[in-house]
Design a protein with these regions (language model features):
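Conserved C-terminal beta-signal and adjacent last beta-strands/turns
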Residues: 2, 6-7, 12, 28, ...
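Acidic, small-polar-rich N-terminal luminal/periplasmic segments of exported/outer-membrane proteins
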Residues: 29-166, 504
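Outer-membrane beta-barrel translocator/receptor signature
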Residues: 91, 108-110, 122, 131-140, ...
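Surface-exposed extracellular loop regions of Gram-negative outer-membrane beta-barrel proteins
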Residues: 92, 104, 253-264, 383-387, ...
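Periplasmic-side early beta-strands and strand-to-turn transitions of outer-membrane beta-barrels
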Residues: 164-166, 174-179, 185-286, 319-346, ...
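Structural signature of Gram-negative outer-membrane beta-barrels, strongest in the C-terminal barrel
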Residues: 234-238, 365-368, 380-382, 402-525
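Membrane-embedded beta-barrel scaffold of Gram-negative outer-membrane proteins
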Residues: 298-327, 460, 466-472, 495-583, ...
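Gram-negative outer-membrane beta-barrel transporters
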Residues: 375-376, 423, 523-525, 545-660
């Protein structure tokens, strides 16, 4: 017995071909089937009535050659966007425009990240380095039945390579610009007749390369030192029991996000003369250091008892560290002898220390060898604690403690009505409880329980095409935001948000299995949607509920194996998001240097100070790109005992509003980046080896990724152009 169970009805069709590996495909002159675990069992994508994109192979590994982190996946999957204002530690995920732009380490997210079947709830845990990955699956839309709360937008699933009986190994070394040196290696195989193991390591290093012109220091910031290791042991004590134990560890030291003061001119969203990628002007922040470590352990046990299989997944995660940064992005202030670049109302530097613990337990049962009905049911328990100590510099540090406990019961079934029609239905009940403990008796306790589910109908039009329709619901648990306590304010609370969505999809394979198309259209409404009001006039971090919101969009994935030498992919996503709350207002930029385009009014804050409010009814969601485009081309030509190859990838991000309110400055338009790698690989003999040259951000685009609006027109940018070479071996 092997787990997870593979569906007997799997059709040799793969969808989301945009993101499949190319090298192995050319040799067969057809596109290989893609297997996913989107429904907690192995299935062909053709059997799954969900909009799913997958990524693996060269398409995946090429993104990380310049020392990139998980944000490199952003816009490379249609409908997926990732950004961070906290360096490599706290990525924020968005799917179909839905996410959370709150930078606070306690903020909940509507996109769930799952690594090797273990949910990573906190943003620090979501940042574990991505290496030795078999595939990535992006599940778009609510996944409330099988995965529960906080999946209203979707899920990003990472599946590591697992141990096999065959002895295998691989190693890859990248050397590039700015002193970039990356190494990734893995080895595994059979240890005894019923025990297998695999261990993988990663190191990513980059030198300081950014000058601090205020202090006169050259190469003062930008360093990366990241080390990670993970391993698995697979054990089969009997013929009907499988055990898989995993452990991982990560150690990070380096530079956090760099905020650049007044690089946006009032009335314009183009970078101005204050911006120089290789220069900052910091008088605080001590070089914006960031240090974190993370360890985790998980145990999966599968027991085949004949007609049924019982599965248990137990996991523990722990992480701690700190980030310190110059938030105003410049030096001095208007009331000090000097300031710059541009207008600095007041200095701001903050350090956050975090200690994260998480425990999860899942028990489920499913039937085996079902002729017409496959079902699974289970229970899930989640318990997490987070302590955040914030030092704003002008008052004593404050520690705020968060705890979150959740229970769930779930079930889902696939009923094969005929050879062509399949009905899928799922339901889940969830209880979610959150507590906050803060100084001066500012304690808060909130809880909620919800029922979510899905119903879909799939029709196989032929052996190579299908259509489906799906309705689904989900919810994000209530939220507590306690960051303002550290700045003399009070905590805020938001009720649970609930989503209802409908989507229709089409999947097809044609041209003798050399082309694949995956398309979906959808519409969703979110009641009591949670938004984070970050910064602005008054410099607060508050969670709020809007009455309602909605979005409509589409996704398209296409892959075409032109011939044995050329493989092309294309991805496209469009989403139109809208906030629907006629009375909802938020504070605009604190510096008054930005240009709001929303209706505004002058009011008073909690301290009686004048503040400019904007009505955000009808606005798009923050950090929700209206369009994303991606394109790749792979070329291979056999020579001698191997082949020469070239691979290029490009992505474009359309109009994106950074904050809840709209301005002329804090929005991005038609940003794009591309990469290229070319070389020679030998694929005959006892082992394969490869040598290549690569370039990331080949045109050296200077793109805004986000902003800080409470002080001045501050922004942070993308990664620089990185060029280099790599050598790898695999056996």
């Amino acid at each position: 017995m092997k787990f997870p169970i593979r569906a007997k009805t799997a059709i040799a069709l793969a969808i989301s071909g945009t993101l499949a590996t190319g090298a192995s495909l050319a040799s067969a002159q057809v596109l290989e089937e893609v297997i996913v675990t989107a429904q907690k069992r192995e299935q062909s994508l053709m059997d799954v009535p969900i909009s799913i994109a997958t990524m693996s192979g060269e398409r995946f590994t090429s993104l990380f050659e310049g020392g990139a982190d998980v944000r490199a996946l952003s816009t490379r999957v249609p409908g997926l966007y990732i950004e961070s204002s906290n360096g490599r530690v706290a990525p924020r995920f968005y799917i179909r425009g839905l996410g959370n732009s709150d930078f606070d380490l306690a903020a909940s997210q509507p996109v769930s990240v799952i690594m090797d079947e273990v949910v990573k709830e906190n943003v620090v845990l979501k940042s574990f380095p991505i290496f030795d990955i078999d595939r990535v699956e992006v599940l778009r839309g609510p996944q409330g039945s099988l995965f529960g709360r906080n999946t209203t937008a979707g899920i990003v699933k990472f599946e590591s390579f697992k141990p096999t009986e065959e002895f295998t190994g691989r190693a890859k070394l990248d050397v590039g610009d700015y002193g970039t040196v990356n190494f990734e290696g893995a080895v595994g195989g059979g240890i005894t007749d019923n025990l297998q193991g695999r261990v993988a390591v990663l190191t990513q290093n980059r030198d300081d390369w950014i000058d601090n012109d205020y202090t006169g220091e050259s190469d003062a910031l930008g360093e990366i030192e990241e080390k990670a290791i993970k391993g698995f042991l697979a054990w089969q004590p009997t013929d009907n029991i499988d055990v898989l134990f995993g452990a991982h560890y990560r150690d990070l030291e380096g530079t956090s996000s760099l905020f650049r003061a007044n690089v946006l001119t009032t009335g314009d969203n183009d970078l101005n003369e204050n911006y120089d990628r290789e220069t900052v002007y910091f008088d605080e922040g001590d070089g914006n250091p960031q240090e974190y470590d993370n360890d985790g352990y998980n145990l999966k046990v599968g027991w085949d008892i004949g007609a049924y299989t019982l599965t248990s997944i137990t996991a523990y995660e722990n992480a701690n560290g700190y980030s310190f940064g110059d938030i105003d992005g410049g030096f001095g202030a208007v009331f000090l002898p000097e300031m710059g670049p541009g207008f600095i109302p007041f200095p701001s530097a903050t350090q956050d220390d975090a200690d994260v613990e998480q425990f999860t337990q899942e028990l489920r049962i499913n039937n085996n060898d079902a002729e017409r009905l496959f079902w699974q049911a289970g229970v899930f328990y989640f318990d997490a604690d987070l302590d955040v100590k914030t030092d704003p510099g002008f008052t004593d540090p404050t520690t705020v403690s968060h705890s979150n406990e959740s229970w769930a019961v779930f079930g889902q079934g696939d009923y094969y009505l005929t050879d062509q029609w399949t009905l899928t239905a799922g339901i889940r009940w969830t209880y979610d409880d959150k507590e906050l403990d803060a100084p001066a008796g500012q304690s808060t306790d909130i809880d909620d329980d919800q029922v979510s589910g899905n119903l879909s109908l799939a029709y196989n039009m032929s052996d190579n095409s299908m259509v489906w329709g799906k309705i689904a619901s989900g919810f994000r648990g209530p939220s507590i935001q306690g960051r303002d306590v550290a700045f003399g304010g009070v905590s805020s609370v938001a009720d649970s948000e609930t989503i209802n969505s409908i989507e229709f999809g089409y999947k097809a394979e044609f041209l003798d299995n050399r082309a694949r198309l995956n398309a979906a259209v959808y519409y969703y409404e979110v009641d009591d949607i949670q938004f984070s009001v970050v910064g602005g006039d008054g410099n607060s971090v508050t969670v709020i509920n809007a009455d309602s919101s909605n979005a409509a969009g589409m996704e398209l994935d296409l892959q075409f194996l032109v011939n044995e030498y050329v493989d092309l992919t294309f991805g496209y996503a469009y989403v139109d998001t809208e906030i629907d709350d006629s009375n909802l207002e938020v504070a605009t930029c604190g510096s008054r240097l930005c240009t709001p385009t929303d209706p505004t009014r002058l009011g008073l804050d909690q301290f009686g100070q004048p503040i400019l409010f904007a009505n955000i009814d009808g606005n798009p969601f923050p950090q929700a790109p209206e369009t994303t485009l991606s394109f790749t081309a792979s070329f291979r030509y056999p020579v001698s005992r191997g082949e020469i190859f070239a691979f290029t990838d490009w992505a474009m991000q359309g109009d994106t509003n950074i904050f809840l309110y709209e301005t002329k400055e804090y929005k991005t338009e038609d940003q794009f980046e591309g990469g290229l790698r070319a070389g020679y690989r030998q694929t005959s003999g006892d082992y394969d080896w490869e040598v290549a040259a690569f370039v990331r951000n080949i045109t050296d685009e200077e793109n805004i990724q986000g902003g800080v609006d409470f002080n001045n027109n501050t922004a942070f940018d993308n990664e620089p152009r990185i060029w280099g070479g790599s050598v790898s071996v695999e056996f």
